[in-house]
Amino acid sequence: MEKMKATRNNMKYSVVMSVYAKDNPEWLKQAIDSLLNQTIQPDEIVIVEDGPLTLQLNVVMSQYKNSGIISIVRLKRNQGLGNALNIGIKYAKNELIGRMDSDDIAIPNRFQLQLAEFEKHSDLDILGGQIAEFVDDPEEIIGYRKVPVTHFEIKQFARRRSPFNHPTVMYKKSMIQQIGGYDASIIRLEDYDLWLRAIAKGAVCANLDDVILKYRSTTDAVKRRKTFISLRNHIRARIQFYKKGYISLSDLTYGLATQIILFMIPTKLAKFAFKKAVRE
């Protein structure tokens, strides 16, 4: 108990979340409530409204106007996740920033676990964790997305796949800004690009072995991966990674072949293949 109090007093943190017009109002409320119900509550929650919201989303947002810790940044037009997160990071007042998506649910002690790790390892720059997937009912878990735990394992894993579950990460603001933040031109893989650049610059990385977030799995997410635009974005991004020296030619070939196969096979089979890949 004493250790928890020390962490609460000495390590304040912000949470950055982006919301846009196509988000589900009920899911957004669940996401925000999961932040407010943390065993160690954030010092502030920065929510970037990425363009005008629907009436229903505005109703949800209005419920938290007197929370005392939620700061809202409104963008006149939709700028995409990368830009929205960069703006949120800029507005965040604390060095430690937790990421959160507008449709997921943070485990109650998520940030208590992450803060304890940052307190234990002062050189740590990026810390993620494991996620449990659900469809409709957060209590009915359909699977887990496992990522490597140690810095060495993360570096090896990152050559072919993103080594972090993006909505679970907590990172140092100074480090993220030092490497230029998210590259908004890397559509869909802006987080993967960020991790590769951070690792290349010597960032110290780790993942907790604990499940710290419940991730909402939808068929729409798989369908978006199977569009020609998504395939084109993945190909462009991976070629850039190769040109910058982040991945080898064999890593590039593996990544391109995987994306092309997922694009060509039926959606149900693609969903099965994707889930099998991220859970192994």
Question: Locations of the language-model features?
Answer:
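Non-catalytic, C-terminal membrane-associated alpha-helical segments of glycosyltransferases
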Residues: D220-E280
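Nucleotide-sugar donor-binding/catalytic module of glycosyltransferases
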Residues: E2-T227
